[in-house]
């Protein structure tokens, strides 16, 4: 009898121990999820961007007066603008190098640094705040370009943000590079024990994509190990007649803008 009581007691102690460990781990993930998703890096406020092409540095006030920094690269006789949302790492110091991908094809391109990235102020807190920032930046560029000449583009984490933005506006087209079907689902594959209701970022691309009536172009590398290719295969099934899917053979997650097949197809799209 005493042995049975002892076993029950030890079982309860072990259960309590594992519960405490679980709560501690979940709490850590909850309070650090922004840093786990966004690998931001700051640049000095007096940092001078150095690119061998014409560009303008823009500072846009967000809803809470936080300053959002972006670069507008310009080309002669521009056909329009590409509003570009980059991935979860890197700043305009490096992302600006890909601007020529679009300026060489006759389009101006605006690249935004999210909060805490580069020279942008503030800290990212949640999905709603991030979407508000992006919407304000987009409306600012709409005051310079007719919206029917603006193409929204997003790479990696930026793909879900771009999809939401396009679903709430009327751009010329939407270009997605290495998109995820659902960020909620993608993050669960990385941290399966973390409850969905505690996540600050859901970014359900699959929910917003069907709402978009302008041309949609999806590019995904077949060798992508970060956001598996299957994500775009599933998104492709949701596309209507306005959708186009371009698999890029042997392409990983990084470096798509330098991919020759991507560049050739982009040339056709933007002609």
Residue ranges and their predicted role:
Residues 18-61:
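An N-terminal hydrophobic leader/cap segment in hydrolases
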Residues 63-140:
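Membrane-embedded segments
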Residues 98, 205, 214, 228-237:
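Short alpha-helix in the alpha/beta-hydrolase fold that links the catalytic acid
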Residues 145-156:
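Alpha/beta-hydrolase fold nucleophile elbow
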Residues 159-214, 260:
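Hydrolase active-site cap/lid region
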Residues 212, 218-220, 224:
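Short beta-strand/loop motif that positions the catalytic acidic residue
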Residues 223-227, 253-254:
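Acidic catalytic loop of the alpha/beta-hydrolase fold
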Residues 251-261:
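Catalytic histidine-centered segment of alpha/beta-hydrolase-like enzymes
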């Amino acid at each position: 009898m005493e042995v049975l009581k002892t076993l029950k007691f030890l079982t309860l102690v072990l259960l309590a121990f594992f519960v405490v460990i679980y709560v501690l781990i979940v709490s850590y993930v909850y309070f650090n999820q922004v840093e786990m998703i966004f690998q931001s890096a700051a640049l000095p406020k007096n940092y001078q961007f150095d690119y061998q092409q014409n560009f303008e540095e823009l500072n846009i006030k967000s809803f809470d007066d936080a300053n959002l920094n972006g670069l507008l690269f310009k080309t002669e006789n521009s056909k329009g603008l590409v509003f570009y949302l980059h991935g979860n790492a890197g700043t305009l110091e490096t992302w600006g190098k890909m601007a020529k991908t679009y300026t060489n094809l006759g389009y101006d391109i605006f690249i935004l640094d999210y909060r805490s990235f580069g020279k942008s102020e503030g800290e990212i807190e949640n999905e709603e705040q991030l979407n508000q920032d992006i919407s304000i930046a987009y409306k600012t560029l709409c005051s310079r370009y007719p919206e029917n000449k603006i193409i929204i583009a997003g790479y990696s984490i930026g793909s879900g943000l771009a999809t939401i933005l396009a679903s709430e506006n009327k751009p010329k087209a939407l270009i997605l590079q290495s998109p995820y079907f659902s960020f909620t689902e993608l993050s669960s594959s990385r941290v399966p024990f973390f409850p969905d209701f505690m996540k600050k970022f859901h970014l359900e691309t699959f929910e917003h994509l069907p709402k978009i009536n302008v041309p949609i172009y999806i590019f995904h590398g077949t060798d992508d190990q970060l956001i598996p290719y299957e994500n775009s295969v599933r998104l492709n099934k949701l596309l209507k007649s306005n959708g186009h899917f371009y698999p890029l053979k042997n392409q990983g997650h990084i470096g798509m803008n330098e991919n020759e097949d991507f560049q050739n197809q982009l040339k056709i799209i933007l002609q």
